[in-house]
């Protein structure tokens, strides 16, 4: 096995909401659509390394909970693994509003 990279950081759930406009303070806005995908700095770097065929090990804590379950399933589907498992805590999420 050749040299590789160690990728340390976060794997999070990105919840992307399509909206007509960014809401002003104190106002509401309704989403036209929603999608969910894995994001986070470490995951994004690992995904790019995988596409370029670079050996890497992803150290991104994967917890327990609904966000962690989604992330774990998507990591497996994409061929990524993380040996860091955290009991009693869920992964985070980022709510992204896109005009």
Which role does the model predict for each range below?
Residues 1-61, 66-70, 76-77:
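Glycine-rich phosphate/adenosyl-contacting loop at the front of the ribokinase-like
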